[in-house]
């Protein structure tokens, strides 16, 4: 098949670098253009990132020679070069909202890793295995924007991936509330230990805005499409605390869950539901989809960040330590790779879903 021509807006940051790495040899997508801030514009990609390449794998050779465009000044040029763009810029939210809408109105679909449009009512925020039906609001968004091809779709916050996928197949039992404590790697802040030495041998009990996202964004994922907008779900109620911990990659969550009276499933039922859980990403056999989305470990000391974050190329969710609790019904531990499943990898999977469903077509 002819590959889609793809651009990355915000390609020099850590998530942008992940996009560059993931698009190397992708069967559907070919990286054609990279845009960033004015200070990087005009440089070769490698010249722009050589002193801050943050990944533990080499920069793809094909990307090194690409000339970096100015994400704002070169918007018309970039939009004309590609079939769609990924967006992972570091800008104020109002500026991101305006930039993404500029590209959409230039008929360039945007698949965004940013949070700026997550609460825009006609912008789908999608985990492909959980709420692919929300893509239906794209037509209403196109009417609002006055576009034929252009639209914005976003992925959810990286913290959600370690617990929402595990809770989702249990919603049928009347999940009433959950308490979540997340332990989030420093790459979630776009940092390495070399650039953030204060995090060595440290844990910080605060990540700005993260607890609100962790409590509220699941309700949009579990919401419904109504009159061209997404109406968030009323429950389950989630309370969260979020910690920054001394790991390079991998977000872990300790999760406590309570079901409605008389609806509590057995441990065996929960494990069976996790093992059987599949979504459109698996059914469509999308290139980036894990074959088994949720993996349960019976060992009492798993999942572990170092051992399990790269399960199924970093796109699966690892679960363990499911047991009864004295205050809630059950508790368990979840783990996901925050810059793969939780960021660039999740966005690539979303783009694959959009292409497979005809929302993104080649120019």
What function would you assign to each model-found segment?
Residues 5, 14, 28-79, 179-182, ...:
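C-terminal substrate-binding/catalytic lobe of Rossmann-fold NAD(P)-dependent oxidoreductases
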Residues 1-205, 237, 322, 348-363:
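N-terminal Rossmann-like NAD(P) cofactor-binding subdomain of oxidoreductases
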Residues 311-363:
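NAD(P)-dependent Rossmann-like dehydrogenase/reductase catalytic/cofactor-binding core
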Residues 95, 162, 266, 342-343:
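Secondary-structure boundary/capping motif
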Residues 91, 259-261, 338:
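Non-catalytic surface loops within mature trypsin-like serine protease
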């Amino acid at each position: 098949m002819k590959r889609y021509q793809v651009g990355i807006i915000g390609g020099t940051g850590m998530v942008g670098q992940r996009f560059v790495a993931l698009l190397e040899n992708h069967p559907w997508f070919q990286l054609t253009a990279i845009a960033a801030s004015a200070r990087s514009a005009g440089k070769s990609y490698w010249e722009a990132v050589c002193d801050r390449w943050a990944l533990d794998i080499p920069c793809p050779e094909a990307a090194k020679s690409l000339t970096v465009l100015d994400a704002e000044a070169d918007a018309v040029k970039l939009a004309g070069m590609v079939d769609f763009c990924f967006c992972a810029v570091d800008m104020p939210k109002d500026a991101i909202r305006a930039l993404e809408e500029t590209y959409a109105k230039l008929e360039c679909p945007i698949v965004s890793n940013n949070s700026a449009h997550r609460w825009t009512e006609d912008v789908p925020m999608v985990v492909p295995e959980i709420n692919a039906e929300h893509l239906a609001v794209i037509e209403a968004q196109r009417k609002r924007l006055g576009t034929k091809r252009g639209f914005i779709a976003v992925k959810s916050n990286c913290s959600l991936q370690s617990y929402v996928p595990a809770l989702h197949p249990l919603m049928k039992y009347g999940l009433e509330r959950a308490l979540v404590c997340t332990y989030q790697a420093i790459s979630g802040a776009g940092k390495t230990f070399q650039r953030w030495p204060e995090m060595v041998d440290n844990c910080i009990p605060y990540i700005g805005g993260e607890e609100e996202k962790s409590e509220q964004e699941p309700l949009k994922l579990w919401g419904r499409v109504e009159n061209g907008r997404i109406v968030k779900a009323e429950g389950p109620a989630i309370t969260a605390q979020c910690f920054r911990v001394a790991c390079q990659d991998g977000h872990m969550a300790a999760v406590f869950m309570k079901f409605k009276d008389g609806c509590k499933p057995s441990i065996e039922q929960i494990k069976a539901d996790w093992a059987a859980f599949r979504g459109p990403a698996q059914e469509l056999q999308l290139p980036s989809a894990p074959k088994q989305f949720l993996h349960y470990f019976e060992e009492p000391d798993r999942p572990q960040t170092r051992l399990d974050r790269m399960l199924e190329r970093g796109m699966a969710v690892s679960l363990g330590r499911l047991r009864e609790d004295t205050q809630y019904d059950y508790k368990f531990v979840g783990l996901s790779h925050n810059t793969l499943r939780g960021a660039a990898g999740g966005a690539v999977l979303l783009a694959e879903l959009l292409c497979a469903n005809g929302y993104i077509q080649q120019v």
